[in-house]
């Protein structure tokens, strides 16, 4: 019995450490999904840096107790898979896209730092651009005036050189 208890404590400790680093948790109900489908989802999740696992709900409740995600405990009923990630948009996006392709995988709820989200909120979060996309758009917006100014400064000597080349070609 103690070995079994130690194994259970290890699972709760592992999930608790992931929850401590997390910015978002998405829980989904999976009824009748095949192993191959789950394997594809696990691979996608791992590539995106998402901790994805199927565990007993009592273990998950203990892992989120006394954390900003403790409000999810009421939604932890039935056969659930847990996606835990440091990027809320990526976590929601990976699981939402998988749910669109598989009708037996249904997003049930989610949470971000004290905010419990419904399945519709998770879907809305999933359609947002990722952090990298937003940063690249911001950087492009910030660089545009500078780049335009540099091109304008460069145009004066370029016009002069083109004028000299035209005079040279004329002679």
UniProtKB/Swiss-Prot annotation:
<comment type="similarity">
    <text>Belongs to the universal ribosomal protein uL10 family.</text>
</comment>
<dbReference type="InterPro" id="IPR022973">
    <property type="entry name" value="Ribosomal_uL10_bac"/>
</dbReference>
<keyword id="KW-0699">rRNA-binding</keyword>
<keyword id="KW-0687">Ribonucleoprotein</keyword>
<dbReference type="GO" id="GO:0005840">
    <property type="term" value="C:ribosome"/>
</dbReference>
<comment type="function">
    <text>Forms part of the ribosomal stalk, playing a central role in the interaction of the ribosome with GTP-bound translation factors.</text>
</comment>
<keyword id="KW-0689">Ribosomal protein</keyword>
<comment type="subunit">
    <text>Part of the ribosomal stalk of the 50S ribosomal subunit. The N-terminus interacts with L11 and the large rRNA to form the base of the stalk. The C-terminus forms an elongated spine to which L12 dimers bind in a sequential fashion forming a multimeric L10(L12)X complex.</text>
</comment>
<dbReference type="Pfam" id="PF00466">
    <property type="entry name" value="Ribosomal_L10"/>
</dbReference>
<dbReference type="InterPro" id="IPR047865">
    <property type="entry name" value="Ribosomal_uL10_bac_type"/>
</dbReference>
<dbReference type="GO" id="GO:0006412">
    <property type="term" value="P:translation"/>
</dbReference>
<dbReference type="GO" id="GO:1990904">
    <property type="term" value="C:ribonucleoprotein complex"/>
</dbReference>
<keyword id="KW-0694">RNA-binding</keyword>
<protein>
    <recommendedName>
        <fullName>Large ribosomal subunit protein uL10</fullName>
    </recommendedName>
</protein>
<dbReference type="InterPro" id="IPR001790">
    <property type="entry name" value="Ribosomal_uL10"/>
</dbReference>
<dbReference type="InterPro" id="IPR043141">
    <property type="entry name" value="Ribosomal_uL10-like_sf"/>
</dbReference>
<dbReference type="GO" id="GO:0070180">
    <property type="term" value="F:large ribosomal subunit rRNA binding"/>
</dbReference>
């Amino acid at each position: 019995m103690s070995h079994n208890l130690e194994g259970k404590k290890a699972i709760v400790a592992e999930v608790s450490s992931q929850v401590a680093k997390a910015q978002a948790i998405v829980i989904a109900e999976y009824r009748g999904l095949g192993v191959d489908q789950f394997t594809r989802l696990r691979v996608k999740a791992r590539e995106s840096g998402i901790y994805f696992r199927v565990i007993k709900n009592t273990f998950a409740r203990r892992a989120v107790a006394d954390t900003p995600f403790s409000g999810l405990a009421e939604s932890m009923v039935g056969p659930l898979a847990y996606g835990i990630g440091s990027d809320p948009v990526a976590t929601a996006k990976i699981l939402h896209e998988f749910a669109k392709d598989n009708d037996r995988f249904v997003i049930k709820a989610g949470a971000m730092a004290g905010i419990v989200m419904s399945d519709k909120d998770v879907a809305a979060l999933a359609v947002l651009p990722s952090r990298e996309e937003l940063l690249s758009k911001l950087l492009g917006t910030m660089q545009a005036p500078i780049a335009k100014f540099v091109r304008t400064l460069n145009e004066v000597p370029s016009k002069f050189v083109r004028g000299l080349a035209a005079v040279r070609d004329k002679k």
